[in-house]
Amino acid sequence: MKNCPKTLPESEACDGIWPWCSDNTLVQFNVVSDHKSIVDGYAYDSDWGCRNSVFQYNLSYNNDGGFMLVIGTNGWPEDWCVNGNIETKVRYNVSINDGLRNYLTSASHKDTYFSPVMHFTGYTQNTLVENNLFYLFPKPEPQIDRTLFHFTEHDSSYGKGDVFENNYIYAPEMTVAVKEEKSADNKYSGNKFVGSLQIPAAGFEKQEGIFNKSLWYNAEDKNWNILLDFLKDKTIPINGKELKVLDVIGAN
């Protein structure tokens, strides 16, 4: 999916690929780019009432809203849909230059230019975010959001017990790693970054040098080879030129 325009009113939200009130959904081997929906505008979304969703081996780039939304709600009848968002897994994906919204919206977050790379809102429980590559670019305008992971309230609830481990981040300008607000019991470990990242007390480690394969690739983990095979023919536009994704992430 690419080049989704700003056609919907602010009363309607839209993302690239999004299961809703679903169990055991598998989303893999997809590309979403240049999503410009006024509300949301993420490449991927594990939405209300989902359990055990898996998002893996996907590519996302240049999306106004960001790479991904994980959202849970609260207070629904149990025979209609599960409350919250339970055990979504986000693994072995690549996000490049996501989170570009340069305007305010009246629908939500109306006081900020809100577009974190990943947004967790409402009751998200035991989400696992692991072994993803987040390659950030300098934002083209000073007011644009510079946040990697952001938790917010929805239906009077917040995330709890979400796990972030072994993710790899390139941040060429100062970016906030996590805004937790009132979420609780989240865990961070083994995350590595090159560049400038405002980090919590533990779980993120700065690496010197350049962002390339030596930082994140493990030949004994077949998932990396599956991802690289999917990306081998993919290109993205950068400064008017089509560049190979594998070159951007330092895999070649």
Please identify what each model-predicted range represents.
Residues 1, 8, 26, 59, ...:
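Generic detector of leucine side chains in alpha-helical contexts
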Residues 1-7, 15-18, 23-36, 42-45, ...:
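Right-handed parallel beta-helix
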Residues 7-19, 38-47, 63-81, 104-121, ...:
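Extracellular beta-strand/beta-solenoid scaffold signature
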Residues 111, 127-129, 137-141, 152-252:
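Acidic, glycine- and Ser/Thr-rich low-complexity intrinsically disordered tracts
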